[in-house]
Amino acid sequence: MKSGFVSIIGRPSTGKSTLLNSICGHQISIISSTPQTTRNKIKGIFTDKRGQIIFIDTPGFHLSKKKFNIALMNNVHSAITETELILYVIDIQDEPGIEENEILTIISKSKINFLVVINKIDIQKTKEREIMIFLEKKGIKKDNIIKISAEQKINIEEIKDKIYANLQEGPLYYPEEYYTDQEMNLRTSEIIRGVTIKKLKEELPYSLYTQIEILEDRKNKLFIKANIIVAGESQKGIIVGKGGQGIKAIGEEARKIISKIFEKKCDLFLQVKLRKNWNKNSKLIKNLIN
């Protein structure tokens, strides 16, 4: 039986979280077209008769000197050092740039085995030729490259095979039925944040986080009271929406997802609160990003 830890890295919006969810068969990480939706190192667990793979989904790799981004990049570097294999995900629509060079430099210095995963092959207009030329110039062998569509689940079984081929014999780190090690509070908080980002799309920057005040199981029914924290006054109005329709829609969708995942009915109460410039508070950022 084989087992091991595998980090998933790449630029923002390349489909890292979709890949994690597709392999594990559950919604573990937030999926959004908004770059850098993933903040924490999210663990997903896949177990079959061959063994167990523990995936670590990481924030999108983006070069920036902002405090929040620096904290996210520290998470990426930390995840790489914890794993036996790296999945480097490239969006087939993106022409290789400075981030690709930097990521491959980091991988090379780590001395850790890696696979280049070219994602979204179901899309018509691509930069596949430019990507392959770039990888060839970097000395990446074709055996280390796999082309997939995480969303359409194309070549997902093949990527599992390649991962197992790179892992050593080892024990099961988690019980077979586990597909994540996230605590209920964190999962619930991330579901609410994910729905908020999805509903607002480009209207709201990344200046929000969610905070669970109460999460209780009351006679086999979840009672949840949570806050959506924003950094600016104008953002409160965007989330609440006209006549409270925005926050109502967020609550309804989040409630459905929470009920489905935890297989229990759910009472969810949301409130939007202002914490001015929280995204410039280094201590708070450190607490939010683990």
From Swiss-Prot:
Record-stated family: Belongs to the TRAFAC class TrmE-Era-EngA-EngB-Septin-like GTPase superfamily. Era GTPase family.
Stretches the record annotates as G5: 148-150
UniProt cross-references to PANTHER family, sorted A to Z: GTPASE ERA (PTHR42698), GTPASE ERA, MITOCHONDRIAL (PTHR42698:SF1)
Region (G4): 119-122
Name of protein: GTPase Era
Region named G1: 10-17
Gene that encodes it: era
Membrane association type: Peripheral membrane protein
GO terms of molecular function: ATP hydrolysis activity; GTP binding; GTPase activity; ribosomal small subunit binding; small ribosomal subunit rRNA binding
Binding site for GTP: 10-17, 57-61, 119-122
Compartments reported by the entry: Cytoplasm; Cell inner membrane
Entry function: An essential GTPase that binds both GDP and GTP, with rapid nucleotide exchange. Plays a role in 16S rRNA processing and 30S ribosomal subunit biogenesis and possibly also in cell cycle regulation and energy metabolism.
Species annotation: Borrelia hermsii (strain HS1 / DAH)
Origin: domain of life: Bacteria
InterPro entries per record: AAA+_ATPase, G_ERA_dom, GTP-bd, GTPase_Era-like, KH_dom-like_a/b, KH_dom_type_2, KH_sf_prok-type, P-loop_NTPase
Swiss-Prot/TrEMBL GO biological process terms: ribosomal small subunit assembly
Record text on subunit structure and interactions: Monomer.
NCBIfam families for the chain: era, PRK00089.1, small_GTP
